[in-house]
From Swiss-Prot:
Region named Disordered: 137-157
GO biological process, one term: translation
Protein's UniProt keywords contain Ribonucleoprotein: yes
Superkingdom per UniProt: Bacteria
GO molecular function: rRNA binding; structural constituent of ribosome
NCBIfam families from the UniProt entry: L3_bact
Quaternary context: Part of the 50S ribosomal subunit. Forms a cluster with proteins L14 and L19.
Designated name of the protein: Large ribosomal subunit protein uL3
Keyword flag Ribosomal protein: yes
This protein's GO CC annotations: cytosolic large ribosomal subunit
Keywords (A to Z) from UniProt: Ribonucleoprotein, Ribosomal protein, RNA-binding, rRNA-binding
Entry function: One of the primary rRNA binding proteins, it binds directly near the 3'-end of the 23S rRNA, where it nucleates assembly of the 50S subunit.
Protein species of origin: Paenarthrobacter aurescens (strain TC1)
Length: 216
């Protein structure tokens, strides 16, 4: 599948949330993402790979902890080893160069973006917390069933539990994408992106900031 649109993206570290005043004296909640040391580590093309994309490396890592195949991969690109890599399919991949550094200035204030991250892990959670079940009545015959899911299926028909039924289980720690967020401001000197609203993940989590897929 060939990319038909230009997509820009950066890997960064979520530093946390704060609030800033806008020009209308309105308090805006923002998430601060630091996106420094992004570099192009590989270029994909349709002739060799069957699709066009750029591979971006981010984050420092001790060279002694890098496997030899990966060390050779980074050496071929002429860059120091990076801890995280991600591929972005974009139609203008040929306009990039190996070893090219990317800064937060590829985005601009007011631009719509998507942020991909790993949601906070909540551990084993019940159906009320995990799926928003209302639970069972607090009285009138309910006996130690207040937070239970209730019936999970029929007896003789269908005499089984359907796949995908909402039950208790591990919650969170999953890849999550928040669409159509807005870049509130950019600090190029400190490589910071101020993104209006919340983004997935905990403080210190690596997130991918990219051009909005839906382009709203």
């Amino acid at each position: 599948m060939t990319a038909t649109r230009n997509v820009k993206g950066l890997l960064g570290t979520k530093l946390g949330m704060t609030q800033v005043w806008d020009e209308n004296n309105k308090l805006i909640p923002v998430t601060v993402v630091q996106a420094d040391s992004n570099v192009i580590t590989q270029l994909r093309n349709a002739e060799v790979d069957g699709y066009v994309a750029v591979q971006i490396g981010y984050g420092q890592i001790d060279p002694r902890k890098v496997t030899k195949p990966l060390a050779g991969h980074f050496e071929k690109a002429g860059v120091t080893p990076r801890r995280h890599v991600v591929e972005l399919r974009t139609a203008d991949a040929a306009s990039y160069e190996l070893g090219q550094e990317l800064s937060v200035e590829i985005f601009e204030a007011g631009q719509k973006i998507d942020v991909v991250g790993t949601s906070k892990g909540k551990g084993f959670a019940g159906v009320m917390k995990r799926h928003g079940f209302h639970g069972v009545g607090a009285s009138h015959g309910a006996h130690k069933n207040h937070r239970k899911p209730g019936s999970i299926g029929g007896a003789s028909t269908p005499s089984r539990v359907f796949k995908g039924l909402k039950m208790a289980g591990r919650m969170g720690a999953e890849r999550h994408t928040t669409l159509n967020l807005t870049v509130h401001a950019i600090d190029a000197e400190k490589s910071l992106l101020l993104i209006k609203g919340a983004v997935p993940g905990a403080r210190g989590q690596v997130v991918l900031v990219r051009t909005a897929v839906k382009g709203a």
